Design a protein with these regions (language model features):
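Active-site donor/metal-binding and catalytic loop motifs
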Residues: 239-255
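N-terminal membrane-anchoring/stem segments of glycan-assembly enzymes
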Residues: 1-37, 189
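Short beta-strand-to-loop acidic/aromatic patch adjacent to the donor-nucleotide binding site
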Residues: 129-140
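Short, well-formed alpha-helical segments that are part of the catalytic scaffolds
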Residues: 50-63, 76-79
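Acidic donor-binding loop at a coil-to-helix junction in glycosyltransferase catalytic cores
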Residues: 218-225
C-alpha cells in the first residue's frame, strides 16, 4: 500500500510538470522594457534577530531612502545601534513595529509570524510611495527595481510575481531544485498570484488591503497573500524579472524546508 501511494504521488507530480510545461506556453508573461521605469516605490526589508542577516545592503544602496528596514520592538540595544549605523551609511530608513517576538524557553523565536507582522505594520503605519517591493534581506534582483515596477505600472496591474532563480552551483539536491523552480515559474504564467516571499511587488494600497486580511501564518504567507489578492479581484501578472535565491544545499536543510512548507 505504501509503495502504491508513493507511485501515485510521483505520477501526480510528473503530471503537474507536464501540465505546467504544456499549458504555460498558452499564457503570456510581462517582459521588461528598459524604456519604461518608475521611481515611485518603497522597498520593505524585514530584518530582526541579527543584522548579519541583512546581506543585500550594497545591492539596495542606489535606492537610498526608498528602502525601509522593518524590525521589531524586541531587539537588543546592540542590534538597534548596528541597524542605525547601516541605515545612516546607506541612506535607508528604519521602521520599528510594536510587535515583540515571543520567547521559547531561553531562546527568542525569530521565525513564525515575525516577518509578515513587521511588513504588515510598515504597510499600515509607515509613509510609503505608491508601489511596494517586498524583499527578503538576502535577496537581489538581476534587473533594476525601477524596471520591474515600471512593468507593473505599464500593465495596469495591482500586484505581481517574478521569476525566482536558485544558485547554479551545488550538489544534486540543488540541481533538482533548479528544475523544480523552472516548473514552478512556468505555473506562475498561468497563476501569477502565486507570490514568492523572496520578492513580490504591488500597489501600496492593494498590499495594505491584502495584509490587513492576512492570517500571518508563516509557512503559507506568500501564497496566502496572492490568494487574498485574487479573491479581492485584484489584477495579478507574472513579470519576467529574475530574482536570485539560495536553495538548500544539503539533504537535511532541504528536508527541514519541506517539512516547514507542509505546514
Amino acid at each position: 500500500m505504501i509503495v502504491i501511494t508513493l507511485l501515485v504521488g510521483i505520477l501526480f507530480w510528473i503530471g503537474i510538470d507536464i501540465w505546467a510545461g504544456i499549458t504555460s506556453k498558452w499564457y503570456k508573461a510581462v517582459e521588461l522594457n528598459p524604456n519604461i521605469t518608475s521611481d515611485d516605490f518603497s522597498v520593505l526589508v524585514p530584518i530582526y534577530g541579527n543584522v548579519k542577516y541583512l546581506q543585500n545592503a550594497d545591492y539596495l544602496r542606489p535606492y537610498g531612502d526608498r528602502v525601509v528596514l522593518c524590525t521589531t520592538s524586541g531587539e537588543s540595544e546592540e542590534f538597534y545601534r548596528d541597524l542605525e549605523d547601516i541605515a545612516i551609511r546607506y541612506g535607508f530608513r528604519i521602521f520599528r513595529s510594536n510587535y515583540v517576538p515571543r520567547k521559547v524557553g531561553r531562546k527568542r523565536s525569530t521565525s513564525g509570524i515575525t516577518r509578515d507582522t513587521v511588513v504588515r505594520d510598515a504597510l499600515l503605519a509607515a509613509p510609503l510611495n505608491s508601489y511596494i517591493v517586498c524583499l527578503d534581506a538576502d535577496t537581489t534582483a538581476q534587473e533594476p527595481l525601477t524596471h520591474i515596477i515600471g512593468a507593473l505600472v505599464a500593465n495596469k496591474a495591482d500586484f505581481a510575481s517574478v521569476t525566482i532563480v536558485p544558485q547554479k552551483k551545488g550538489p544534486f539536491i540543488v540541481q533538482m531544485q533548479r528544475h523544480e523552480y523552472v516548473v514552478s515559474m512556468r505555473a506562475r504564467r498561468i497563476m501569477p498570484w502565486l507570490l514568492s516571499g523572496a520578492l513580490h511587488i504591488g500597489k501600496t494600497d492593494v498590499m495594505r488591503q491584502i495584509m490587513a486580511r492576512h492570517s500571518l501564518f508563516f509557512q503559507g504567507n506568500d501564497i496566502e497573500s496572492g490568494i487574498i489578492g485574487d479573491a479581492l479581484g485584484y489584477k495579478a501578472v507574472h513579470i519576467l524579472a529574475h530574482v536570485n535565491t539560495n536553495a538548500p544545499d544539503t539533504l537535511y536543510s532541504w528536508w527541514r524546508q519541506r517539512i516547514a512548507w507542509s505546514g
